[in-house]
Amino acid sequence: MYFFDKHPNFKAHTLFEDDCGQAATYETWYAHADELGGIMPSRSLAAIVCRNTIGSALSYLCCLQRRVVPLLLDEAMDDELKQGLLAAYRPEFIFCPHGTEGGKPLYSLYDYDVYRHNNTSPALYEDLGLLLTTSGSTGSPKLVRLSYDNIQSNAASIAQYLELTAADRPVSSLPMHYTFGLSVINSHVLCGAAECLTTATVFDAAFWKFCKEKRVTSIAGVPFTYECLRRLKFTAMELPDLTLMIQAGGKLSKKLQKEFGQYAAGTGKRFVVMYGQTEATARMSYLPPADCLRKIGSIGVAIPGGSFRILDDDHAELTEPNAIGELCYDGPNVSLGYAHGADDLQLGDERHGRLLTGDLAYCDEDGFYYIAGRKKRFVKIMGKRVNMDEVEQLFKNAFADRDFACTGGDDDLLVFTTAPETDCSDLEDFLVAKAGLHPSCFTIRSVAAIPKNSSGKTQYTDLPGLKD
């Protein structure tokens, strides 16, 4: 039995409470799933335009229970990019907020409606359970294919090492289309717990009022979230019911890890640093709270059921302490592989439980792992993984007469362009609109030329040294 199947012992439990005074029980979910079963055949494909509301979260859980494969999309994604994804994957059904689609819906649940989007669904692999985007809001057609066992095993591991129970009450501090935010739902549903859903952000007074009213017990955040919490003087807030803070979605600065680790230790709370990727469903490692201040900068140890190895360039294992190589993860939560279009949805398991993370790492003498850098060209922007090659392509597709190149680090994307300085403001607006990135997290610089080698490939290592 999976956590998203019917559990008789949970029927009367509250599943979701929102900031509009509404609530849903597990029995409510089961009833909606039964109704949808008469409308949507199992093994069909359904897109869900996600936001942190009861209707959106129920849509996801109903799909899992009916064995309908959900494709989760960010509500804030640019409409042109969203339509491109829908055209590439041809979902038979679409769940979306009230009033965003024309015509009469097939079914409604809370603030969401279900519509038929295509006459049929593409062929689906028998164990395919979920499709997630890989790069935030850039509209890349590349999706991660997850199996039901992937979803179940990762939820169970997270619940185990975080010691979750039915009494826990997390707040939706991250979007549900994002693998980290979704894992909070999954791991708590597995325990019969309730999640408190709000569309407010940590910057809103309403968010903290909601946390107090609902007696929230845990909060999840990416490094940017914790930067914001520091500025908001979170450690001085009165949140007596909050007992757990979790972090993933990029490397947290040592200063912040120490600050929040000390706060947790001094107030009887737990602060847990973690590491994961969408390709591993969500989580691959965690740093036990007892080691938070002893192992500053570490991503910790592999989650229950998983294991790490450090590999050299020839994929031979490096066993000596502190040797840097590519981090390789083995576990039941490793995804089936990627999809680039509807035809790929019938592919089987291409990874067989092993993931080369693309991150360079080392293991210390005590068995704790540390990320040293990246092999691949992606960065984390406010916790969202952004592929710099895809950002370049976005610009090049829209501004064919200009050249572009991207470099940078987490929350510090640098876009170099041959467009004149006077156009940089328009380019900034374009990136905000198309990719949903906050202007504080990227810089656009005008240069005379993008450095290339003799074969025409961009010399990225030369970019940071360019002068205007």
Residue ranges and their predicted role:
Residues 307-330, 365-366, 424:
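Conserved beta-loop-beta connector loops within the AMP-binding
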Residues 8-12, 115-133, 140, 163-169:
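Conserved pre-ATP/AMP-binding loop-to-beta segment of ANL
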